């Protein structure tokens, strides 16, 4: 064999063994073979996909694309995607070695996605679910403003429709190119989950895959009612080398693995990929009859300043509302009036007497359907509200409460 032939064979072998990740949009020139990251065995990509990207030699779970994950979990022809065309922008005009816009364009062309998550609804063994799947191939699955917005919208939709939420996490953390806008998504998603879990009493299952790190781990990834993980998944916040350099200590070999977290009580279950759909199906079947499950209601609060039309509607509502459906916001009004009664007692002593009587008559609300009308038209109460916070603030507060409970005044 000549030297040129040997070099050519080595080049072809290197091309075949290169670890490529095929998406449906990928070009065939990316290769037909890949190598296991754990044992190094060469794997035929077509057969690897059929085995859900689990190594035939050692059982190691290689990374899956979000599309492959959805196909493995959702029943055929039931997937309905949300917000497919929502695309990130570059608010900070960030640039390191390459402009952020160029990185986004490259990732979108390579993966066929607009950002690092796919969200939507579908059926899992006939059970309706709201599903979000992160894709590590898109800029390391980093969480930017679009990822946070899509996940938040998914959770809010699930809350309104009474659906369980399943999020499959695979991320390197918050996206540094978007700065504080990416960090804000941690709080936004967590707030939506609080309403979904604690107010609507609906189920949220978090599936942790390798890797799940950074701001995703510090927020919604670890907030699930149930935490599932794949075997040997890398799960943590800071990197291993960063921790070792900070502590000046050698960490255990299995540190930040799914097995390590399960041993220390931070996970509920480690599920092999081939059994994940079955485990989720059995869990959802058990939860389906839960007595506390209910369709949710999301309190949005006031959105922007009052318009002149809305302000006039609220003024009329203060004078003429007689409908019992508004009575459920009286408790909040009583709390506000109680606070005013404690802070302004020296100027209007008669107001304090009225408010104290109001606090001691809890059953009054049930007996009198016109309580809300009398409360708002009371001269003493009007004086208290106007004195403490002014008419405009009172209208803003009322607008907030009506919007929170999705009430539209009838005029």
From Swiss-Prot:
Quote the cofactor binding remark: Binds 1 zinc ion per subunit.
What is the name of the protein in this document? Acetyl-coenzyme A carboxylase carboxyl transferase subunit beta, chloroplastic
From the Swiss-Prot or TrEMBL record, state where the protein is found. Answer: Plastid, Chloroplast stroma
> Which residues are in the CoA carboxyltransferase N-terminal domain?
32-302
User: Zn finger regions (C4-type) covering which residues?
Assistant: 36-58
- Note whether Metal-binding occurs among the keywords: yes
- The main place the protein resides is plastid
Q: What is its EC number?
A: 2.1.3.15
Tell me the InterPro entries matching this sequence.
Answer: AcCoA_carboxyl_beta (IPR034733), Acetyl_CoA_COase_Trfase_b_su (IPR000438), ClpP/crotonase-like_dom_sf (IPR029045), COA_CT_N (IPR011762)
What is the documented function of this protein?
Component of the acetyl coenzyme A carboxylase (ACC) complex. Biotin carboxylase (BC) catalyzes the carboxylation of biotin on its carrier protein (BCCP) and then the CO(2) group is transferred by the transcarboxylase to acetyl-CoA to form malonyl-CoA.
Reaction(s) catalysed (UniProt annotation): N(6)-carboxybiotinyl-L-lysyl-[protein] + acetyl-CoA = N(6)-biotinyl-L-lysyl-[protein] + malonyl-CoA
NCBIfam families from the UniProt entry = accD
One term under GO cellular component: chloroplast stroma
Organism per entry? Chlorella vulgaris
Family stated for the protein in its record: Belongs to the AccD/PCCB family.
A Pfam family that the UniProt record links to this protein: Carboxyl_trans
Residues where Zn(2+) binds: 36, 39, 55, 58
This entry's Gene Ontology molecular function terms read: acetyl-CoA carboxylase activity; ATP binding; carboxyl- or carbamoyltransferase activity; zinc ion binding
Which GO BP terms, alphabetically?
A: fatty acid biosynthetic process; malonyl-CoA biosynthetic process
Pathway in which the depicted protein is active = Lipid metabolism; malonyl-CoA biosynthesis; malonyl-CoA from acetyl-CoA: step 1/1
Keywords, sorted A to Z: ATP-binding, Chloroplast, Fatty acid biosynthesis, Fatty acid metabolism, Lipid biosynthesis, Lipid metabolism, Metal-binding, Nucleotide-binding, Plastid, Transferase, Zinc, Zinc-finger
Asked if Transferase is a keyword of the record, the answer is: yes
Q: What's the cofactor?
A: Zn(2+)
Subunit organization: Acetyl-CoA carboxylase is a heterohexamer composed of biotin carboxyl carrier protein, biotin carboxylase and 2 subunits each of ACCase subunit alpha and ACCase plastid-coded subunit beta (accD).
């Amino acid at each position: 064999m000549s030297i040129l032939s040997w070099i050519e064979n080595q080049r072809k072998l290197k091309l075949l063994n290169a670890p490529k990740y095929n998406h449906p949009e990928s070009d065939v020139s990316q290769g037909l073979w890949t190598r296991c990251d754990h044992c190094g065995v060469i794997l035929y990509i077509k057969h690897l996909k059929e085995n859900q990207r689990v190594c035939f030699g050692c059982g190691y779970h290689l990374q899956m694309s979000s599309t492959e994950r959805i196909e493995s979990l959702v029943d055929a022809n039931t997937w309905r995607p949300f917000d497919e065309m929502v695309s990130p922008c570059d608010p900070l005009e960030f640039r390191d070695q390459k402009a952020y816009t160029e990185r986004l364009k490259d990732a979108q062309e390579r993966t066929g996605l607009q950002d690092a998550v796919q969200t939507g609804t579908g059926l899992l063994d006939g059970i309706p679910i709201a599903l979000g799947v992160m894709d590590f191939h898109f800029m390391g699955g980093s969480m930017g403003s679009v990822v946070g917005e899509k996940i938040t919208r998914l959770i809010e939709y699930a809350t309104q429709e009474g659906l369980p939420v399943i999020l499959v996490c695979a991320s390197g953390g918050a996206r540094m190119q978007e700065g504080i806008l990416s960090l804000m998504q941690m709080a936004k998603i967590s707030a939506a989950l609080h309403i979904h879990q604690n107010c609507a009493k609906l189920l949220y299952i978090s599936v942790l895959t390798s890797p799940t790190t950074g701001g995703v781990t510090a927020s919604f990834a670890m907030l699930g009612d149930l935490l599932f993980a794949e075997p040997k998944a890398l799960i943590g916040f800071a990197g291993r080398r960063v921790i070792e350099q900070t502590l000046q200590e050698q960490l255990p070999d299995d540190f930040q693995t799914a097995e390590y977290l399960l041993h220390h009580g931070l996970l509920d279950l480690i599920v092999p990929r081939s059994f994940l759909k079955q485990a989720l199906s059995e869990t959802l079947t058990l939860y389906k009859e839960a007595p506390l499950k209910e369709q949710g209601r999301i309190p949005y609060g006031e959105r922007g300043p009052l318009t002149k039309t809305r302000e006039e509607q609220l003024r009329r509502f203060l004078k003429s509302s007689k409908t019992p459906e508004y009575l459920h916001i009286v408790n909040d009004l009583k709390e506000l009036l109680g606070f005013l009664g404690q802070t302004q007692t020296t100027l209007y002593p008669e107001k304090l007497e009225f408010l104290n009587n109001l606090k001691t008559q809890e059953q009054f609300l049930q007996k009198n359907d016109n309580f809300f009308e009398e409360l708002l038209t009371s001269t003493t109460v009007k004086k208290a509200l106007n004195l403490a916070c002014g008419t405009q603030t009172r209208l803003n507060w009322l607008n907030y409460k009506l919007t929170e409970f999705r009430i539209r005044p009838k005029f």
